[in-house]
Amino acid sequence: MTIKDFGGRIASVWEGLRPMTRSMLVGALQTSGSSSSPNIKAPKFSYDAHADWELSRLLSALDEQSRTTDAQNDAETLGEMNKLADTCASLLETQSGSAEVFIQLAERALRRHDYKKLDRLADRLSERFSAGEIAEIIRQTESPQIRAIAYETLAMLPVNNVAPLLDDSLYTDIAAAALEQKAFEYDSEEAKEILDQFDADAFRRNG
């Protein structure tokens, strides 16, 4: 079976991959064997923002094609397609720190009702993502479940990681909500003090 058997769009996306990204995928497929391991070892290739974009685009094409009637009626092709898609997803899970990619992976887990995967993604969020990227997830996502996960993670970060976002107009409300959660659900006096100071500064500016 070749990549062309997956359909024209997937073949086109595959042909557009850089050689290093294709090699990374092939190596990851060989590592995972016949199983869809959630913990593919980090590939011995350079990973950059463009690889992020390439893998995300390929995963979107694979997931979209796998939901078509033609794919659903061909078990062998569907199985191979899902194997490649799971490999893309696992690489993105272990390597990416992008808000857009996190949303894509979390939405994929929700579609599959894969709540163990969603829990792993939540763990990755606290390990790999900056406060700004977590706030960007909250800003972009339309999913209440994903927003709740991101807010919970943001509220668990140190106050000095979240507080600077109060000065960014894109994230002011998000940061304030996360600090309120930290102050009242986690009894953080530091968060309460930051919020009190923020409210006082806002009052002076508006007064």
Regions found by a protein language model. Give the residues of each.
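N-terminal "cap/leader" segments of large eukaryotic alpha-helical scaffolds
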Residues: 2-33
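Structural detector for internal amphipathic alpha-helices that build alpha-solenoid repeat scaffolds
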Residues: 27-31, 40-60, 72-97, 107-128, ...
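Terminal, low-structured helical/coil segments at or just beyond the last alpha-helical repeat
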Residues: 191-207
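Short, charged low-complexity linker/loop segments at the C-terminal edge of domains
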Residues: 187-189
